[in-house]
């Protein structure tokens, strides 16, 4: 009875409240609408523009790899055969150096000579070179040794000092600078000469010889890659960097042809073109590669006036590869070209396998690049997966998803980037050594090579969980490496300390 009276009273009260439009009070949380400030919106707009730019550049390179690096390379039939001088600088013993040097002797090209340049007559690498010359008596090959007591010294760059004698002594105008620690396919020289003479970049013409429109290729280079031949952290990270982030942007920038982007592992150009570029530097209109005046113009005029000595001018720079490409590009109005080939370096030396070695190598070259291409180096960390994804997620979340950071989108970004890198890694790994020319492929360049044990017999894919581990580690380390590089100017190269000056030259300490 009491319960019935209570229910009746509640019903009467509800009807009365409804009659007077009185709603019962219910406590609700006070949720403020998402309203970012004008400054944050502007920042998000800038971030999304940059995010889109990075994605466009990255996938521009990725699709070029899918198109031009995903199949067996063919051997062109050149309309005319020009002689080529192959210069291979030696400094000590590198991992699998004999196999790397042998790749020059195996080139499927009818007319070339090999000059092996050695800094000192006591260098231990001389024995390896001499054995190869005996093994290939039909190949025009010789060793040029420096004077151990009075070595060539045109500047602090030991590689240029070593190469200078071979550059001057070469029989042919076309020079192929090929480091002693890289291996190339047997058809690489033929494709490179064809690209130089017909002005091709990955098979596409860049210059109309009838109308004169476009830029003529005057430097041919090959994508640098590295294979870890032992299961060590440092070499695995190098392999991951070169097969993913570096190759993607390296190929993309080269295709866009807005500025030179060249690694010096494997470069082919005409000696007469480089001598001409140095001569023009010395005339004073553009006295140096960074626009400064003074002794650089004087030195350029001196070396440019003597045929076969233009290379010596670049001994003042640690990054001579980029500076040579810059001179050929801006002084001679040329551009660079790729051929679909790779310069493959086996990594596994005693002093190069640790995580510390990897960190020091990356810091060293970032410090060099900081002085050569400052703007690009400052922006570099924003092109890496994690930081780029952070900017992109903030921008898209702020502008479209009513939040400051949507973790679901960030994870989606990471997964797409990782799958892209995984696909690209294995496309390059599978096809880097594939050539229709007769090619003696060394074990480390075989697609199924496994540094962790027996070869991958049924698949050339790296073990996924191990691949992901090194991929994540490399991505996480990218920003700390960049910060460390930006905070210093001193570098250690070939066990020698250097400082990079504001005019881009190097000073040995």
UniProtKB/Swiss-Prot annotation:
Task: Cite the annotated pathway.
Answer: Lipid metabolism; sphingolipid metabolism
List the Cytoplasmic topological domains: 64-384, 430-466
- SUPFAM superfamilies xrefs: Nucleotide-diphospho-sugar transferases
Cite the Pfam families for this sequence. Glyco_transf_21
* Motif D2 positions after renumbering to this chain: 179
Q: Name the top EC class.
A: transferase
UniProt-recorded name of the protein? Ceramide glucosyltransferase
User: Out of the domains of life, which is the source?
Assistant: Eukaryota
Transmembrane regions: 43-63, 385-405, 409-429, 467-487
**According to the UniProt entry, where does the motif D1 sit in this chain?**
123
**CDD domains, from UniProt?**
Glucosylceramide_synthase
Q: Where is this motif: (Q/R)XXRW?
A: 361-365
EC?
A: 2.4.1.80
> What is this enzyme's catalytic activity, as reactions?
an N-acylsphing-4-enine + UDP-alpha-D-glucose = a beta-D-glucosyl-(1<->1')-N-acylsphing-4-enine + UDP + H(+)
The GO biological-process annotations, alphabetized, read as: glucosylceramide biosynthetic process
Domains: entry comment? The D1, D2, D3, (Q/R)XXRW motif is a critical part of the GCS active site, involved in catalysis and UDP-sugar binding.
**What role is this protein assigned?**
Catalyzes the final step in the biosynthesis of the membrane lipid glucosylceramide (GluCer), the transfer of glucose to ceramide. Glucosylceramides play important roles in growth, differentiation and pathogenicity.
The family assignment reads: Belongs to the glycosyltransferase 2 family.
Query: What is annotated as the active site?
Result: 321
Q: Where in the cell is it found?
A: Golgi apparatus membrane
Molecular-function GO terms, alphabetical: ceramide glucosyltransferase activity
* Bilayer topology term: Multi-pass membrane protein
The entry's cellular-component GO terms read:
Golgi membrane
């Amino acid at each position: 009875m009491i319960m019935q009276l209570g229910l009746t009273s509640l019903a009467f009260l509800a009807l009365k409240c409804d009659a007077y439009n009185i709603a019962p009070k219910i406590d609700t949380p006070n949720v403020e609408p998402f309203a970012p400030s004008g400054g944050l919106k502007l920042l998000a707009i800038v971030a999304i523009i940059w995010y889109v730019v990075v994605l466009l550049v990255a996938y521009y390179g990725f699709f070029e790899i899918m198109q031009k690096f995903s199949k067996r390379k063919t051997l062109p039939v050149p309309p005319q055969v020009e002689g080529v001088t192959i210069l291979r600088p030696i400094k000590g013993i590198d991992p699998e150096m004999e196999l790397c040097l042998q790749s020059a002797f195996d080139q499927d090209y009818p007319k070339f000579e090999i000059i092996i340049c050695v800094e000192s007559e006591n260098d231990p690498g001389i024995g390896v070179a001499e054995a190869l010359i005996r093994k290939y008596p039909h190949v025009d090959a010789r060793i040029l040794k420096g004077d151990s007591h009075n070595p060539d010294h045109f500047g602090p760059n030991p590689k240029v000092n070593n190469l200078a004698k071979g550059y001057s002594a070469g029989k042919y105008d076309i020079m192929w600078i090929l480091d002693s620690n890289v291996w190339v396919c047997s058809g690489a020289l033929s494709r490179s000469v064809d690209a130089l003479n017909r002005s091709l970049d990955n098979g596409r013409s860049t210059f109309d010889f009838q109308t004169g429109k476009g830029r003529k290729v005057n430097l041919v280079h090959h994508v640098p890659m590295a294979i870890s031949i032992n299961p060590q952290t440092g070499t695995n990270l190098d392999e991951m960097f070169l097969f993913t982030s570096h190759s993607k942007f390296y190929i993309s920038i080269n295709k866009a042809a807005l500025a030179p982007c060249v690694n010096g592992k494997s470069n082919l150009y005409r000696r007469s073109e480089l001598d001409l570029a140095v001569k023009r530097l010395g005339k004073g209109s553009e006295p140096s590669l960074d626009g400064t005046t003074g002794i650089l113009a004087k030195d350029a005029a001196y070396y440019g006036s003597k045929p076969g000595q233009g290379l010596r001018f670049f001994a003042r720079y640690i990054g001579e590869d980029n500076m040579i490409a810059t001179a050929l590009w801006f002084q001679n109005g040329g551009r660079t070209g790729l051929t679909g080939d790779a310069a493959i370096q086996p990594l596994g030396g005693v002093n190069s396998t640790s995580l510390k070695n990897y960190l020091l190598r990356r810091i060293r070259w970032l410090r060099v690049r900081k002085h050569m291409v400052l703007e690009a180096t400052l922006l570099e960390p924003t092109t890496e997966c994690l930081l780029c994804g952070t900017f992109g997620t903030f921008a898209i979340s702020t502008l479209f998803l009513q939040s400051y950071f949507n973790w679901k989108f960030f994870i989606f970004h990471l997964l797409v980037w990782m799958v892209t890198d995984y696909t690209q890694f294995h496309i390059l790994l599978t096809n880097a050594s594939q050539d229709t020319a007769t090619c003696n492929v060394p074990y480390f360049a075989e697609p199924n090579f496994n540094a962790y044990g027996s070869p991958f017999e049924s698949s050339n894919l790296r073990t996924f969980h191990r691949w992901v581990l090194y991929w994540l580690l490399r991505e996480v380390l990218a920003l700390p490496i960049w910060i460390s590089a930006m905070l210093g100017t001193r570098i250690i190269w070939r066990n020698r300390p250097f400082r990079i000056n504001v005019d881009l030259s190097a000073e040995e300490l």
